[in-house]
Regions:
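N-terminal small/polar loop signature for handling phosphorylated ligands or for N-terminal nucleophile
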Residues: 1-61
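Hydrophobic helix-and-loop "lid/oligomerization" segment in the mid-to-C-terminal part
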Residues: 1-20, 37-38, 118-278
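Hydrophobic/aromatic beta-strand patches that form the interior of the parallel beta-sheet core
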Residues: 9, 40-42, 64-68, 79-82, ...
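Short, hinge-like loop/turn segments at secondary-structure boundaries
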Residues: 26-30, 60, 82-86, 234-235
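Short glycine-rich anion-binding loops that position phosphate/pyrophosphate groups of nucleotides
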Residues: 46-49, 71-73, 187-188, 222
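Short glycine-/acidic-enriched loop or helix-start segments at secondary-structure transitions
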Residues: 51-55, 77, 228
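Short alpha-helices
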Residues: 68-135
Length: 278
């Protein structure tokens, strides 16, 4: 938008510090919205307005809302540019930039590459196809350093976060019949291990590694006592349907939700939903 001389405000609702493993991204562009109504608002990678947090009312008051996503059936937006087969929303955005003949700088390429790397699990998930590799190659030709970005995201973790990882692993409970496992991060863990919620985003990818499970859940306690859940699937099992039970969303292999229920109630409901699918 800057290259087109279009005035814009970049906003992102986040609680606490942004994750340090994403410091290579231009977070300096993020600012606090200073208008009550915006003419056009673009929303990326968000299937439900409820997931916009404090920005929800501001976005919904916009004259026009454009949703760019790879999640199925977003519940809001005047214009929806969606491809549920895309591995990442950045894959959809890349196509838009190319089709419109817009320049992709190294800084833009790094942002797009980050989305590809994280949403494909370093190009390991089943959503990784030939187009993903073609886009990654083009982004590298524009100056994006795949190796450096991948190392920054996955190869460098604070020691305290590693210590918390061991605690989360200790808490894992496995239902062998359903091939479902889950663990939890409590609020007190953040103070005990001197970490922030943003620094624990990688933990779901640790929990999902157990070969005895097909479905993994990591619950994170929020300051108000509610829980945010991250779901992952290692097979064709559709965890989006599990998330939708709690009015959450995502896609087949990875989804999320929020709930005011207790841990036991959340687990019971998820197990019941799993039984309906198998």
């Amino acid at each position: 938008l800057d290259s087109l001389n279009i005035e814009s405000t970049v906003a992102f609702d986040v609680t606490g510090e942004l994750p340090s493993n994403l410091n290579h991204l231009p977070f300096n562009l993020i600012s606090t919205p200073d208008k009550d109504v915006y003419k056009t608002t673009y929303v990326f990678d968000c299937g439900s307005s409820s997931r916009l947090g404090k920005l929800e009312s501001l976005v919904l008051n916009s004259e026009k809302i454009v949703v760019v996503d790879h999640h199925i059936d977003p519940t809001f937006g005047d214009l929806q540019i969606i491809d549920p087969k895309a591995a990442s929303t950045t894959q959809v955005l890349y196509r838009i930039l190319i089709e419109e003949g817009l320049s992709i700088t190294q800084e833009i390429a790094d942002c797009l590459m980050t989305g590809l790397i994280t949403d494909t699990g370093r190009f390991q998930y089943s959503n990784t196809n030939s187009e993903v590799f073609s886009i990654a190659a083009d982004l590298m030709s524009k100056g994006s350093n795949l190796s450096s970005i991948s190392e920054n995201i996955y190869g460098s973790i604070e020691l305290d976060a590693l210590k918390l990882q061991s605690k989360v692993i200790e808490r894992i409970e496995l239902d062998r019949e359903l091939r479902f496992l889950h663990s939890v991060v409590y609020q007190e863990d953040y103070s005990e291990f001197k970490t922030t919620p943003a620094e624990t985003d990688f933990l779901i990818d640790v929990v999902r590694l157990a070969k005895e499970s097909d479905i993994a859940l990591l619950l994170k306690e929020q300051t108000d006592g509610s829980f945010k859940g991250s779901l992952r699937s290692r097979t064709d099992f559709n965890v989006q349907q599990l998330a939708s039970f709690f009015d959450g969303g995502g896609h087949k292999a990875a989804s999320g939700f929020s709930s005011d229920l207790s841990i036991d109630e959340i687990i019971l409901n998820i197990k019941n939903e799993i039984r309906k699918q198998i």
